[in-house]
Each structure stands twice: as structure tokens, then as C-alpha cells.
């Protein structure tokens, strides 16, 4: 992927940097692999906002992606590389030899016409999926299962990959993109390679309207709200927050406070917390 930089022809193009989409080979999705996507816009069943800054945006159709890669020992050919509005990574359309079609996350350097397969004895080629115990040390993997046969759950974002550090007993040690070092069972499947679109973090919207197209609503500072809306609100003019420390809109300490539960079952498998 490459980034297209814009000149300051208008205020909306000043500082704009968007994807060039040069890797996209097909513009319309496969009809058999899409479904309606009802988005909650950050509201619960009573219409109350539970997640702020969500709403609006262009309608999206969900692409059904094969995170499990459980179609073992059946070869698939990459027919197209497509855009997915629901994620930063690109997706690849596979045509299997038995006639079935599926989407997978598109790894870097996987091109149209390449062949991929998943299974216990799959080759160590980009795009192939196999158990962690079959992958050598130092290899980069993505779309990793946390529990066998549940499907890939971690390392699925654009440009991410995990590195295999060690194997001991029933577990494999991986370094995740967050620098967390974690144990995962050796039977869990993972896909070889790095997720595509590793320049996604360089994208700059350039104008507020384009951010609204993506379904993101404005973030308002607490200091400009009323006291009834935020602990930092109120005062005459630009007043200080008037508290010993910054607080969230719900009155809990913010900035530097750990929010992870201290009695999670997965703590036993985390050798080093993320930095």
C-alpha cells in the first residue's frame, strides 16, 4: 500500500493523506459473502449512549471473513484483493478447488494468482494457516487463535504481526504487536505473514466531514462542558479543572490508571504485560 499526499488546493485537502488503493483489484464485493450490518451507533436497547463518539456515517455491508481457516487440505487461489469498509486491512477473495469462495485477511506480499492452503502439513508460505507447533521460531504470524477451533481472535489489525519466541511443552511463546509476551496452546492455528496495509496509521483525514463519513462523532473536552455534564466543567471562562487529578466523565481517575481486571484467568498466560 502507498499513501497519496494532497496539495493545499482547498482547506479540505490541506494536510490530507489518504490511501492510494493501488492494491485493490476488484471494486464490488462477492454477493454470496456479504450480509446486512445493523450498527448500534453506540446505543443500547433503550437508546441510551453506552459508547460515545459513534453515529452517522455511510452504510456498510458486512463481509463474511473466514477467521477460522478450517477448510483443511483444500487449495485456494487468490482471485481478488478487495477493500473492506469494516476494517483497515484489505481482504483477499479465495476460490477453492471444490468451487467454494471465501474471504480471508490479506497478508502482505500475497498477490492475485497465488495459492494458499490450511492444514497440519501446510507449507511455510505467506497466507497458509497451520498450528503454532508447526511454525518455526522467529516466524511472523497473524490471525491467531486463543482457544483451539475458535478461530483467529488476535493480531488482525492492519500492518500487525506476532513473532514466535519459544516452544515449551503444550505452549508456544509469542510477542504480540503491543510488546506483550504471552503463552498460547500449540494446537492453535495462525496464518503466516503480516496483515496488509501497514501504512494505515499514516492516513490523515484532512477535514471533519470525512471523519463523519466513517461514523465518528466529535470528541468534546470536559473543560468546556457544564458541571452537570463533566467533572471538569463549569467555572468562569477557561477555568482549571478544580480537582487533584483528571477525571473521566463518570468521576473515575483518568490518565495512567490501569483498567484491566486484576483477577482474569488469562493472567496466568501473560509473561510480560504490554508496554
Swiss-Prot record:
Coiled coil: none annotated. It is found in: Plastid, Chloroplast. Gene3D superfamilies: 2.30.30.30, Nucleic acid-binding proteins, Ribosomal protein L2, domain 3. The keyword Protein biosynthesis does not apply. One of its GO terms (biological process) is mitochondrial translation. Signal peptide: none annotated. Residues 219-255 are annotated as: Disordered. One of its GO terms (cellular component) is chloroplast. It holds the Pfam family Ribosomal_L2. SMART domains: Ribosomal_L2, Ribosomal_L2_C. InterPro entries: NA-bd_OB-fold (IPR012340), Rib_uL2_dom2 (IPR014722), Ribosomal_uL2 (IPR002171), Ribosomal_uL2_bac/org-type (IPR005880), Ribosomal_uL2_C (IPR022669), Ribosomal_uL2_CS (IPR022671), Ribosomal_uL2_dom3 (IPR014726), Ribosomal_uL2_RNA-bd_dom (IPR022666). Keywords: Chloroplast, Plastid, Ribonucleoprotein, Ribosomal protein. GO terms for molecular function: rRNA binding; structural constituent of ribosome; transferase activity. Part of the 50S ribosomal subunit. PANTHER family: LARGE RIBOSOMAL SUBUNIT PROTEIN UL2M, RIBOSOMAL PROTEIN L2. HAMAP family: Ribosomal_uL2_B. Belongs to the universal ribosomal protein uL2 family. NCBIfam families: rplB_bact (TIGR01171). This is Large ribosomal subunit protein uL2c.
Amino acid at each position: 500500500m502507498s499513501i497519496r499526499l494532497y496539495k493545499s488546493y482547498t482547506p479540505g485537502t490541506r494536510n490530507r493523506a489518504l490511501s492510494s488503493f493501488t492494491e485493490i483489484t476488484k471494486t464490488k464485493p462477492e454477493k454470496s459473502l456479504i450480509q446486512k450490518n445493523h450498527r448500534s451507533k453506540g446505543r443500547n436497547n433503550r437508546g441510551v449512549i453506552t459508547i460515545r463518539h459513534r453515529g452517522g456515517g455511510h452504510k456498510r455491508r458486512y463481509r463474511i471473513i473466514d477467521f477460522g481457516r478450517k477448510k483443511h487440505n483444500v487449495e485456494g487461489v487468490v482471485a481478488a484483493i478487495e477493500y473492506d469498509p469494516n476494517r483497515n486491512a484489505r481482504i483477499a477473495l479465495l476460490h477453492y478447488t471444490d468451487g467454494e469462495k471465501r474471504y480471508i485477511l490479506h497478508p502482505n506480499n500475497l498477490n492475485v494468482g497465488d495459492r494458499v492452503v490450511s492444514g497440519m502439513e501446510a507449507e511455510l508460505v505467506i497466507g497458509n494457516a497451520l498450528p503454532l507447533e508447526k511454525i518455526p521460531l522467529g516466524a511472523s504470524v497473524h490471525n491467531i487463535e486463543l482457544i483451539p477451533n475458535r478461530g483467529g481472535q488476535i493480531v488482525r489489525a492492519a500492518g500487525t504481526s506476532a513473532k514466535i519466541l519459544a516452544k515449551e511443552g503444550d505452549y508456544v511463546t509469542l510477542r504480540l504487536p503491543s510488546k506483550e509476551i504471552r503463552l498460547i496452546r500449540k494446537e492453535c492455528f495462525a496464518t503466516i505473514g503480516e496483515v496488509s496495509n501497514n501504512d494505515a496509521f499514516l492516513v490523515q483525514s484532512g477535514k471533519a466531514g470525512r471523519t463523519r463519513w466513517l461514523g465518528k462523532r466529535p470528541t468534546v473536552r470536559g473543560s468546556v462542558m457544564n458541571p452537570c455534564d463533566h467533572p471538569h466543567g463549569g467555572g468562569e471562562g477557561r477555568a482549571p479543572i478544580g480537582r487533584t487529578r483528571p477525571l473521566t466523565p463518570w468521576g473515575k481517575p483518568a490518565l495512567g490508571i490501569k483498567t484491566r481486571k486484576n483477577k482474569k484467568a488469562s493472567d496466568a498466560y501473560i509473561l510480560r504485560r504490554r508496554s
